[in-house]
Amino acid sequence: MATIIYDNETTFDALKDKTIAIMGYGSQGHAHARNLHESGLNVVVGLRKGSSSWAKAESDGLKVMTVEEAAKAADVIMILLPDEKQASVYYSQIEPSLEAGNALVFAHGFNIHYNQIVPPKDVDVFMVAPKGPGHIVRRTYTEGIGVPGLIAVYQDATGKARDLALAYAKGIGATRAGVYETTFREETETDLFGEQVDLCGGLSALIKTAFEVLVEAGYQPEMAYFETCHEVKLIVDLIYEGGLERMWHSVSNTAEYGGMTVGPRIINEESREAMYEALARIQNGEFAKEFVLEGMVNHPVLKAMERQEKEHPLEVVGKEIRANIPWLNKKIDDD
């Protein structure tokens, strides 16, 4: 079982008198930077010249520099850029300024685990990965709570990498909910597996296929959308709040019996084998190689799939239905 560390077991001591550079000011970047700053730590934000986020970060009360300037100024450097951009930015704008005893921090282990970034041996390398989107990391921090997080140490040059990781996790509010110790390998491989097999890939494929079956069987697209896509959130919220047990307890007996008897026929041994195949491609680096090569030519396959997805009948009818839900439109505007 994983080791869990809570707020009362941690201090900011390891980060006192250190400058933390947050590279990037997107969903996670803005949350990390603002939370750390409001925790009393010394934070700078590293952005490219001309970035649309520059003025936003300054208006949030943060000191903003170019990535190169931030790397030179910092003792601890958190890289919160898209996976496919991290290596090029690291080698051209961060590594030249690294000094012995500095620390590199990641929120996902992809580039370290798959050797896209190979840090010098005299710097600490660790991970702090909150298990929630940036706006939730930020909101829960301001509410005095937090989201759970993961920490991992890849390289401990100073002997203080774990202390730094815990202090950083405390600074963003993660220790309030508990941080779980893991490894770069475990975090990377399980994260990719979850994204591909159920959270993003498996779930979206299941929704689309179920929608298509109902429409092909002659049912109205609107009815198919409500039953196969719209109501997913209702079920997921129940699982999120209390696990599968809470979900089964909350639905009707008809839904429970039908779900328990038919579900295993849909997600069956063939599905399990496909999951193992996906996991093997993650473990042996095949997926990483494919993704890196795709990024080197500006993601033509991904862009084509995005276009196809946008044109899918599920998306067309879903857009029309969501336009008629005022409270949902307000939430999207607020986000």
From Swiss-Prot:
Catalysis performed (reactions): (2R)-2,3-dihydroxy-3-methylbutanoate + NADP(+) = (2S)-2-acetolactate + NADPH + H(+); (2R,3R)-2,3-dihydroxy-3-methylpentanoate + NADP(+) = (S)-2-ethyl-2-hydroxy-3-oxobutanoate + NADPH + H(+)
Names of required cofactors: Mg(2+)
Protein residues bound to Mg(2+) 1: D191, E195
Keyword ATP-binding attributed: no
Pathway: Amino-acid biosynthesis; L-isoleucine biosynthesis; L-isoleucine from 2-oxobutanoate: step 2/4; Amino-acid biosynthesis; L-valine biosynthesis; L-valine from pyruvate: step 2/4
Domain KARI N-terminal Rossmann: 1-182
Residues forming the catalytic site: H108
Free-text comment on the cofactor: Binds 2 magnesium ions per subunit.
Entry EC no(s): 1.1.1.86
Gene Ontology biological process terms, A to Z: isoleucine biosynthetic process; L-valine biosynthetic process
Binding positions for Mg(2+) 2 per the UniProt entry: D191, E227, E231
InterPro entries cross-referenced by the UniProt entry: 6-PGluconate_DH-like_C_sf, KARI, KARI_C, KARI_N, KARI_prok, NAD(P)-bd_dom_sf
The keyword Heme belongs to this UniProt entry's keyword annotation: no
Entry-linked Pfam families: KARI_C (PF01450), KARI_N (PF07991)
GO MF, one example: NADP binding
Annotated residues for binding of substrate: S252
Functional summary from the UniProt entry: Involved in the biosynthesis of branched-chain amino acids (BCAA). Catalyzes an alkyl-migration followed by a ketol-acid reduction of (S)-2-acetolactate (S2AL) to yield (R)-2,3-dihydroxy-isovalerate. In the isomerase reaction, S2AL is rearranged via a Mg-dependent methyl migration to produce 3-hydroxy-3-methyl-2-ketobutyrate (HMKB). In the reductase reaction, this 2-ketoacid undergoes a metal-dependent reduction by NADPH to yield (R)-2,3-dihydroxy-isovalerate.
Similarity comment: family membership: Belongs to the ketol-acid reductoisomerase family.
Name the record gives this protein: Ketol-acid reductoisomerase (NADP(+))
Organism annotation: Methanosarcina acetivorans (strain ATCC 35395 / DSM 2834 / JCM 12185 / C2A)
